[in-house]
Each structure stands twice: as structure tokens, then as C-alpha cells.
């Protein structure tokens, strides 16, 4: 790791504090983030972005975890192209985080089951929809159509995505002058940090 700049180190540490709050506080602006993957096909290659809920953050391993329906496109997209991006924005503090990561599906059944058992019932209901995401319907889907007794749903379509952070691009908007910096990450911390023109 390079010799750290005290100001950059403070920013880096503050990023992890806010991300942790985002994972544990529902009303924190970082609780939701834009998660982008690459859709690869013979016809075209294009990005796909959706909002996901930040579920867990680990500064020691430089990872972020979100939950997913195993039938969603992002699961197959990550398997084909694991490099993903995440965008967070705090409107009050005017802080934007753009994160580049390497994402993968968690393979540990024990961890998946434990996370499922700890989830709230209202969250579990999302995984009892009888159709995969993006399925065409004749009318809007109703929660009354949930198949709560179907053993092939619920836990069987519930998955975890763990993303290993590779880069963090920090931007603080300020009328006296925007502040932007980047952190390149490896193993347990940043190896390069530098100021960037906003």
C-alpha cells in the first residue's frame, strides 16, 4: 500500500462507515443502490441497471452483499461477465460513490439458508412469485397470486450476490469546489489513492 494521505484516508474510512449504515439503516440514502451488469448475447452487448438493497458490508474483505432471485437475468449475466458497477448517492450530503467490483453468486448453502432464516417475512414473500422476473403478463401481478405453499419457490429461488470492490470513485459536490478522488483496492485496503478532476 502506498504512503497514505491523511485526508484521503479519512475519506476512505468515512465511505465504509456510510456503506455500513446503508446496510443496517433502512432510511439511509445508501440502503438502495443502482447495480449494473453487462448483458451479453449474439445480437448485442449492453448494460443493464436496476435498484438493489444493500444487505451487508465487510470492510475487512472489501465486500458488499445483496440478495437476488436466482431466476433473474443478473445472475446469468454475472456468471458470464463478473465485473459490475454500483452507484450510491446521498442527496443531503451531496456525496456520490461509483464502485467497480467483481461479483459472484455465494455458493455456500449454509450461508444462504442462514440469511433466509434471518430475513423478515415481508422480504421472503418476494421469492414466492410463481414466474421469473421479466415474464410477460396480461395484467399487473398481484400479491394475492403468491404461491406460498410451492416448495420449489422461496428458499429454492433465493440467492446471495457478493461483490469484491476493486475501485471506489468518490465525489462530494460543493459550491466552493467539488471534491473527487479515487481508490484502487487490493486485498484488505487501497493500494492507490489520488485526487481527480471532478
Outline where the language-model segments fall.
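Binding-site signature for planar aromatic cofactors or substrates
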Residues: 1-198
Amino acid at each position: 500500500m502506498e504512503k497514505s494521505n491523511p485526508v484521503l484516508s479519512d475519506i476512505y474510512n468515512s465511505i465504509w462507515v456510510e456503506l455500513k449504515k446503508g446496510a443496517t439503516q433502512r432510511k439511509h440514502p445508501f440502503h438502495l443502490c443502482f447495480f449494473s451488469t453487462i448483458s451479453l448475447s449474439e445480437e448485442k452487448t449492453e448494460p443493464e441497471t436496476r435498484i438493489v438493497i444493500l444487505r451487508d458490508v465487510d470492510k475487512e474483505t472489501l465486500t458488499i452483499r445483496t440478495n437476488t432471485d436466482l431466476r433473474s437475468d443478473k445472475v446469468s449475466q454475472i456468471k458470464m461477465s463478473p465485473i459490475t458497477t454500483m452507484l450510491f448517492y446521498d442527496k443531503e450530503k451531496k456525496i456520490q460513490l461509483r464502485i467497480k467490483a467483481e461479483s459472484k453468486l455465494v455458493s455456500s448453502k449454509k450461508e444462504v439458508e442462514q440469511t433466509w432464516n434471518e430475513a423478515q417475512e415481508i422480504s421472503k414473500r418476494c421469492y414466492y412469485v410463481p414466474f421469473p422476473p421479466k415474464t410477460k403478463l396480461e395484467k399487473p401481478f398481484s400479491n394475492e397470486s403468491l404461491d406460498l405453499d410451492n416448495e420449489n419457490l422461496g428458499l429454492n429461488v433465493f440467492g446471495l450476490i457478493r461483490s469484491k470492490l476493486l475501485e471506489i470513485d468518490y465525489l462530494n459536490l460543493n459550491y466552493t469546489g467539488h471534491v473527487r478522488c479515487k481508490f484502487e483496492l487490493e486485498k484488505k485496503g487501497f493500494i492507490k489513492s489520488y485526487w481527480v478532476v471532478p
